[in-house]
UniProtKB/Swiss-Prot annotation:
This is ATP synthase subunit C lysine N-methyltransferase. Mitochondrial protein-lysine N-methyltransferase that trimethylates ATP synthase subunit C, ATP5MC1 and ATP5MC2. Trimethylation is required for proper incorporation of the C subunit into the ATP synthase complex and mitochondrial respiration. Promotes chronic pain. Involved in persistent inflammatory and neuropathic pain: methyltransferase activity in the mitochondria of sensory neurons promotes chronic pain via a pathway that depends on the production of reactive oxygen species (ROS) and on the engagement of spinal cord microglia. The keyword Methyltransferase applies. The gene is Atpsckmt. GO terms for molecular function: protein-lysine N-methyltransferase activity. The chain crosses the membrane at residues 31-50. The keyword S-adenosyl-L-methionine applies. Contains an atypical, non-cleavable mitochondrial targeting sequence responsible for its localization to mitochondria. It is found in: Mitochondrion membrane. GO terms for cellular component: mitochondrial crista; mitochondrion. Disulfide bonds: none annotated. Residues 1-12 have a biased composition (Basic and acidic residues). Belongs to the ANT/ATPSC lysine N-methyltransferase family.
Length: 216
């Protein structure tokens, strides 16, 4: 009578024992957990990265991120000639206006709702050597008071300009200057305009705008 081979002898001879249904099920389950974990992690990452960009678009009045062109930055700086005092960029995006203003000698602040853009702006300010005079904060523009700023820059959209016009007229001092890019304010009359097309910049004297509003 022949002796049956032990499991160890079968492995040494190159034979493979058949796997049980329970073992196959366990392997399949492990792969399922791994795939689910990878997909879940990817979805969380995508959500974390894209939410700051998508969330503003879901608000009643949105301020989308559209980078300023080099000519727009030049036009803004041109409108700031002979000006002094702190500057604020409402919806500062990637920080290029604030950084340019800081290089021109202004203590400049940018308010931006998107945290990724704020962190990138801070890095750019550090890299370009103006992090001491260029500051960036994560905030909703409607929750910030701008009374302390002598110079205000805004890259707005048409649907928000009437509401922002009222807010600035209520908060700013008479000596303040407001610079609008891409879209003008609906009721104010600019004292200076420069540029063409999307590079157009409108400059408003706050005192003149208030006088105009009283006459109307």
């Amino acid at each position: 009578m022949e002796r049956g081979e032990t499991p160890e002898e079968e492995r040494q001879s190159g034979c493979v024992l058949p796997t049980s249904p329970e073992s196959d099920s366990l392997k399949t389950s492990n792969w399922g957990f791994l795939i689910t974990g990878v997909i879940g992690g990817a979805l969380v990452t995508v959500y974390a990265v894209t939410t700051p960009f998508i969330a503003p678009a879901l608000r009643k009045v949105c301020l989308p991120f559209v980078p300023a062109t080099s000519r727009q930055v030049e036009n803004v700086v041109k409108m700031l000639q002979h000006r002094r005092g702190p500057l604020v960029d409402i919806g500062s995006g990637d920080g290029r206006i604030v950084i340019a203003a800081a290089k021109a000698g202004f203590p400049a602040v940018g308010y931006e709702l998107n945290p990724w853009l704020v962190w990138y702006s801070r890095y750019r300010a550090w890299r370009e050597g103006v992090h001491g005079s260029a500051k960036f904060y994560i905030s909703d523009l409607w929750k910030v008071t701008f009374a302390q700023y002598s110079n205000v820059v805004i890259f707005g959209v048409p649907q928000m300009m009437p509401q922002l016009e009222k807010k600035l007229e209520f908060e700013l001092e008479d000596g303040a200057r407001v610079i609008a890019c891409r879209f003008p304010f609906p009721h104010w009359t600019p004292d200076h305009t420069t540029g063409e097309g999307i590079d157009t910049v409108w400059a408003y004297d706050m005192s003149a705008c208030r006088t105009q509003g009283k006459r109307a």
